[in-house]
Regions:
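A structural boundary/capping signal
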Residues: 1-170
Length: 170
């Protein structure tokens, strides 16, 4: 609820969870970092996944697993791109749960791929949860991970635009 309540950060920066808490704003990536840090306090490993888009912004989500099923926590201006219950058997299933709601202002469905989970514990020595430094290097780490396509070229060519009511609802 905290992530949904705070304003969206439109600045080109990447704050630590400590700074998100202090400044009371976050963009999608900062929100995912914050969620992963809170999930860690509850005993989950701190994991992020990137949802790669075409003609749109990527979306980063914090992952958690309960009883063998994946769920996610995220920050977004779009309510349909936030929390997911832990009911998905695979990361692909989880990624696909965002598909119909992942669209740009032109009404194009834009989600195309998802990353392997990024393990944030590899950045513990840099104190990623509390540092005052910019954390853009964590975002850069996604470029070293494999991505898995969700659609083939034929499927992309056959996509229909988002329904007008859904586009308005955003």
């Amino acid at each position: 609820r905290f992530l949904s309540a705070i304003p969206y950060n439109s600045k080109e920066e990447c704050k630590s969870p400590k700074r998100v808490l202090a400044e009371r704003n976050a963009h999608c990536f900062e929100g995912a970092l914050f969620a992963a840090s809170r999930l860690r306090e509850l005993g989950y490993p701190p994991l992020l996944m990137d949802l790669r888009a075409w003609n749109d912004d990527d979306h980063v989500i914090a992952l958690f697993k309960e009883r063998g099923r994946w769920g996610a926590v995220a920050k977004s201006n779009f309510t349909t791109l936030r929390f997911r219950e832990p009911v998905y058997r695979t990361l692909r299933e989880l990624a696909m749960s965002y598909f119909d709601f992942y669209f740009n202002t032109l009404g194009q469905k834009t989600l195309r791929a998802y990353s392997r989970p990024l393990k944030l514990s590899q950045f513990d020595e840099k104190n990623w949860t509390e540092t005052e430094d910019d954390l853009e290097y964590i975002g850069d780490a996604f470029s070293k991970l494999p991505y898995y396509e969700l659609l083939d070229a034929e499927q992309v060519a056959r996509l229909v635009e988002v329904d007008g009511d859904l586009l308005k609802a955003g």
